[in-house]
């Protein structure tokens, strides 16, 4: 067996790249204002905002407004001649979501277009009025007790100077005079109706959107016998980008937390979108935990002569160079045992990734032996690829290399382990590599991105993270 102290210097070598850890959050989902706009527009549609506009109580609002004025009786005398007044058509234009100057708030604007008709007994013509008004509200981050932060929508009202009420068609002189009086009575009503009728719908749609964003982050990711769960920590608005800061927890098969990923420090290093609608940034240590959970298998035990007879023959020849007697002991039931000594380490560069593993390799002459002929400690590395297949984020090791080999213990005397470099690489390539790739191929679902409505995605690497964005067309 391998002794922990023997690997101390190996761990030091692999851990050197961890010096100067980043202050980036474990996972960040970054959304552009375009995504926020589309999601909010869909939620308003779900709440049937058009029907709300069509049901606007214009006549009631005019009556309430007139009762407050000094000419109330005169106004009422005009209004009582209106047989009916209702919205005949209504629509909400394209939403606008833009950052405010402070870079920490977003302004939402919703242009409303309403056609209202009314009729009076003296005229058979239906008079149609065109009402244009714009609703606006502010999206910002609200921090409550226990530092709990959330996105909220507030200060909903009409945009100053956006109200326009006009005749839709030309009218006779007398009818136009009446229509002008109705317009003057109607003008104060739309801003108040925006606040009383539309703002509640806008807030309800926003709450639905916020809830959907939170639900996106709560879907657990299965990693063979383990699973990864993301935890919403806080939102951050940075000019035209909304960042959802996420922590992560790794659970074992018994549901116990085995690893916790948190935000380190108060100053966050947040990603930029670079003209993409969204960006999912997964910190390096989280990616390492995912890979480790996928490939974790304990110890591999292989009857080498039975499974890989040619490799068994090459092993016998390689050992014969060191000790002919030991080579002669290798029988048809010779066993190779392979196990990973530590969690793999991920080394990222722009566009490239490499995984380093510490591996213990034991060679037993027969299946009856309790002690190995020798034990090797191997510093192995593999180039790793990330790609998307059938909605899954898939990892794959291209090859495996025995970069350094150390003799841990030996029953055949001390020898230079470099003599076994070729056969060691052969064994790892033939046994460990397909085993690990088979487990990595199960992949992890990228449902968070799929549920946002993005069907094609692209993967890239930085020195600190794996990045998921929309694929370029």
From Swiss-Prot:
Pfam families: LBP_BPI_CETP, LBP_BPI_CETP_C. InterPro entries: Bactericidal_perm-incr_a/b_dom, Bpifb1, Lipid-bd_serum_glycop_C, Lipid-bd_serum_glycop_N. Glycans are attached at residues 215, 422. It comes from the Eukaryota. CDD domains: BPI1, BPI2. It is found in: Secreted. Expressed in trachea, nasoepithelial tissue and in salivary tissue. One of its GO terms (biological process) is negative regulation of toll-like receptor 4 signaling pathway. Its main location: secreted. Residues 1-21 form the signal peptide. Keywords: Disulfide bond, Glycoprotein, Immunity, Innate immunity, Secreted, Signal. Disulfide bonds join 156-199. GO terms for molecular function: lipid binding. One of its GO terms (cellular component) is extracellular space. Belongs to the BPI/LBP/Plunc superfamily. Plunc family. May play a role in innate immunity in mouth, nose and lungs. Binds bacterial lipopolysaccharide (LPS) and modulates the cellular responses to LPS. This is BPI fold-containing family B member 1. It comes from Bos taurus. The gene is BPIFB1.
């Amino acid at each position: 067996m391998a002794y922990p102290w023997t690997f101390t210097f190996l761990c030091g070598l692999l851990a050197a790249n961890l010096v100067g850890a980043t202050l980036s959050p474990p996972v960040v989902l970054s959304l552009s204002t375009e995504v926020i706009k589309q999601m909010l527009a869909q939620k308003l549609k779900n709440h049937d905002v058009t029907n709300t506009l069509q049901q606007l109580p214009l006549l009631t609002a005019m009556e309430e407004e007139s009762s407050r004025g000094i000419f109330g009786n005169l106004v009422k005398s005009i209004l009582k001649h209106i047989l009916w007044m209702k919205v005949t058509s209504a629509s909400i234009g394209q939403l606008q979501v833009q950052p405010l100057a402070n870079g920490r708030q977003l302004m939402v604007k919703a242009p409303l277009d309403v056609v209202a008709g009314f009729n009076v007994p003296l005229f058979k013509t239906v008079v149609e009025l065109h009402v244009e008004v714009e609703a606006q509200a502010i999206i910002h981050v609200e921090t409550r007790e226990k530092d709990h932060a959330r996105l909220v929508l507030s200060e909903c009202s009409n945009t100053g100077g956006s109200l326009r009420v006009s005749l839709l068609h030309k009218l006779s002189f007398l009818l136009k005079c009446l229509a002008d009086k109705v317009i003057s009575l109607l003008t104060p009503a739309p801003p108040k109706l925006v606040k009383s009728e539309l703002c509640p719908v806008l807030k309800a749609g926003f709450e639905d959107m916020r809830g959907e964003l939170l639900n996106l982050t709560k879907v657990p990711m299965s990693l063979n016998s383990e699973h990864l769960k993301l935890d919403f920590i806080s939102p951050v608005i940075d000019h035209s980008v909304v960042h959802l800061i996420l922590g992560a927890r790794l659970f074992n098969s018994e549901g116990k937390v085995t690893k916790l990923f948190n935000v380190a420090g108060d100053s966050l290093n947040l990603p930029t979108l670079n003209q993409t609608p969204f960006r999912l940034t997964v910190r390096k240590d989280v990616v390492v935990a995912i890979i480790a959970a996928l490939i974790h298998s304990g110890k591999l035990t292989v009857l080498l002569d039975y499974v890989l007879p040619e490799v068994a023959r090459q092993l016998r020849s390689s050992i014969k160079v060191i000790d002919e007697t030991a080579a002669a002991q290798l029988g048809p039931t010779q066993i190779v045992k392979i196990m990973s000594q530590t969690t793999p380490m991920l080394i990222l560069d722009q566009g490239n990734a490499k995984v380093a593993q510490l591996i213990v390799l034991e060679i037993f002459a027969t299946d009856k032996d309790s002690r190995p002929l020798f034990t090797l400690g191997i510093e192995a590395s593999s180039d790793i690829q990330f790609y998307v297949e059938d909605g899954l984020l898939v990892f794959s090791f291209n090859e495996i290399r025995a970069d350094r080999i150390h003799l841990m213990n030996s029953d055949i005397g001390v020898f230079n382990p470099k003599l076994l470099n070729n056969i060691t690489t052969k064994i790892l390539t033939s046994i460990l590599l397909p085993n690990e790739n088979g487990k990595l191929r199960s992949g992890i679902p990228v449902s968070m991105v799929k549920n946002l409505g993005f069907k094609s995605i692209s993967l890239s690497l930085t020195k600190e993270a794996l990045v998921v964005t929309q694929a370029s067309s």
